[in-house]
């Protein structure tokens, strides 16, 4: 395809075909638009996500290849299994979405500047309130009964498709526990993969791999046909096994 960068129409939710995304930078598809819930849901339903930094225009991406985790291949090595068996953590679903996004935005391991800007936090909070964005929280209670959020992740779900957005940790293995809990939760209703968008060393260590955009879209479109139980995303405590 020709290397054309599209400008979104503010009055339309239509995106260009994902095959039109640039090869350099990989996956950049369009500029502009807004972070309204309707546009975000339209984007995620087509395998497109926003990603930009402060002072940049709003940019929309659909990279090729795409990073995913096949849940059956989620990697739990012997050391991590021992940590799970002796876990001091409590893991919950959708109990503090706002704090998870704030801590992801300010995670100390970010070295290239945060991309979770205040307007993005607000947009995803609105999606959460509408039932499309969800969080996993990992809590630790110390010997003085002080409870703190020490790890977590959040992402966007449209029917059976879940796209992970960001995660953080303050204690060893906390973000791994969150990812495993998410995988086991999705697997319980026969959802077999998590969209990771872009590969990084942490995700690769947990079993993520890159796949072609065509294969990703095929898997995604199948996931979008799945109907979720009405109470699936209700706030509750989760157990990692």
From Swiss-Prot:
Function: Functions in the N-end rule pathway of protein degradation where it conjugates Leu, Phe and, less efficiently, Met from aminoacyl-tRNAs to the N-termini of proteins containing an N-terminal arginine or lysine.
Chief location of this protein within or outside the cell: cytoplasm
Gene name of this polypeptide: aat
Compartment list: Cytoplasm
Alphabetically ordered keywords of this record: Acyltransferase, Cytoplasm, Transferase
Reaction(s) the record says it catalyses: N-terminal L-lysyl-[protein] + L-leucyl-tRNA(Leu) = N-terminal L-leucyl-L-lysyl-[protein] + tRNA(Leu) + H(+); N-terminal L-arginyl-[protein] + L-leucyl-tRNA(Leu) = N-terminal L-leucyl-L-arginyl-[protein] + tRNA(Leu) + H(+); L-phenylalanyl-tRNA(Phe) + an N-terminal L-alpha-aminoacyl-[protein] = an N-terminal L-phenylalanyl-L-alpha-aminoacyl-[protein] + tRNA(Phe)
Keyword Aminoacyl-tRNA synthetase: no
Protein name: Leucyl/phenylalanyl-tRNA--protein transferase
A single GO cellular-component term on record: cytoplasm
EC number, UniProt record: 2.3.2.6
InterPro entries: Acyl_CoA_acyltransferase (IPR016181), Leu/Phe-tRNA_Trfase (IPR004616), Leu/Phe-tRNA_Trfase_C (IPR042203), Leu/Phe-tRNA_Trfase_N (IPR042221)
GO molecular function annotations of the record: leucyl-tRNA--protein transferase activity
Coiled coil: none
Single GO BP term: protein catabolic process
Similarity comment: family membership: Belongs to the L/F-transferase family.
């Amino acid at each position: 395809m020709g290397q054309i960068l599209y400008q979104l129409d503010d009055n339309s939710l239509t995106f260009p075909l994902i095959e039109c995304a640039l090869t350099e930078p990989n996956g950049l598809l369009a500029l502009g638009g807004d972070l309204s819930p309707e546009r975000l849901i339209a984007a995620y339903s087509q395998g497109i996500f926003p990603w930009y930094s402060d002072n940049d225009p709003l940019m929309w991406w659909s990279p090729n290849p795409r990073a995913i985790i096949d849940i059956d291949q989620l990697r739990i090595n012997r050391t991590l299994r021992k940590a799970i068996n002796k876990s001091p953590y409590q893991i919950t679903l959708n109990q503090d979405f706002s704090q998870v996004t704030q801590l992801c935005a300010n995670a100390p391991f970010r070295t290239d500047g945060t991309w979770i800007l205040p307007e993005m936090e607000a947009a995803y909070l609105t999606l959460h309130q509408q039932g499309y964005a969800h969080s996993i929280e990992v809590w630790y209670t110390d010997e003085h009964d002080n409870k703190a959020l020490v790890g977590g992740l959040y992402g966007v779900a449209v029917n059976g498709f879940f796209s992970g957005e960001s995660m953080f940790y303050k204690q060893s293995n906390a973000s791994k526990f969150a990812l495993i809990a998410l995988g086991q939760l999705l697997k319980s209703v026969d959802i077999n993969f998590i969209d990771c968008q872009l590969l990084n060393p942490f995700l690769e260590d947990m079993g993520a791999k890159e796949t072609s955009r065509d294969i990703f879209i095929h898997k995604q479109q199948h996931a979008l046909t799945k109907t979720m139980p009405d109470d699936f995303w209700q706030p509750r405590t989760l157990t990692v096994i």
